[in-house]
Amino acid sequence: VYSGFSPMELYDEYGYTSYGFGVAKQTLHSVCKQLKSVLKRQKLKLVILEADILYQPNIKKQGSIHYDYAWLFAPFMYHSRWKDLKLRDFFTLPNLNRGNFTNGYFYSDKVNDFNVKPDYMKDIHKPPQKMEKSINKDFYKIYKLCKKYDVPLLVISIPTPHSWDNAKSNGVKELCERYNLDFYDMNLGLDGFDYSCHFRDNGNHCNYNGAKVVTLALGKYLQENYSLANHKGKSNFENWDKKLIEYKKAIASYSHKK
């Protein structure tokens, strides 16, 4: 989600304040810990979980503590070079994230000419793919946490033809129906998303243009299904407006350099 969702684009278009806490190779177990910590300190209006993590390994392996606790520190984007970090790196974000005005979003304007199989979501009747027992257990914990703090939980799936199909989509749909949760799967169709130029890799991570399409579609879905306040330009949210200016300047500057 750190590549496919831009909180500042959401704020610019809909005035919703948000933060993306995703990190690479994150486990659902770590998300559960993360959410518990956040809910103790913040009054959230909505929690959004990206569904791809429900089919990722959830077992601790050597070095996984780096991923499980990466969200506690600033360098979300440094996950592949922990041993090379300097002390200052634990308090500053790299590249466009310096100053933290991207709110967890990882910017990339790289375009990979990806040829998606047009039928990767064709078989809508595929049997639901089962999830690990630990995934079901941790998902239930997340569900209970949201219930405890009276926060709606929305599950989404960002376009990911590299690893997604209808078996997984139906598995998540079945899981969400069990707990009476909303599930928004953008793989089933997303207006304006171009699979040939909206990825920075082989169909797994969106680039900036892809993230904009995803973010605005998500914003529309939230507007139609949830009662969230538009804070843009309102008093007490001046810092967000200043952050948005920084964000736009940084992206314009970076794009110009390219």
Question: Which residues does each PLM region occupy?
Answer:
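Acidic-and-aromatic substrate-binding clefts and catalytic sites of carbohydrate-active enzymes
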Residues: 25-29, 131-133, 161-168
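Active-site-proximal beta-strand/loop segments in catalytic clefts of secreted hydrolases
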Residues: 21-24, 50-52, 156-159, 186-189, ...
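C-terminal regions of proteins
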Residues: 170-240, 254-257
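A generic structural signal for well-ordered alpha-helical segments
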Residues: 11, 146, 175-176
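Membrane-embedded segments
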Residues: 1-79
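Loop/turn elements at helix/coil->beta-strand transitions in domains of secreted/extracellular proteins
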Residues: 16-17, 42-46, 147-154, 179-182
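Secreted/periplasmic serine-hydrolase-like ester/acetyl group-modifying domain
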Residues: 51, 60-152, 231-258
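Generic structural signal for well-ordered alpha-helices
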Residues: 35, 139-143, 169, 173, ...
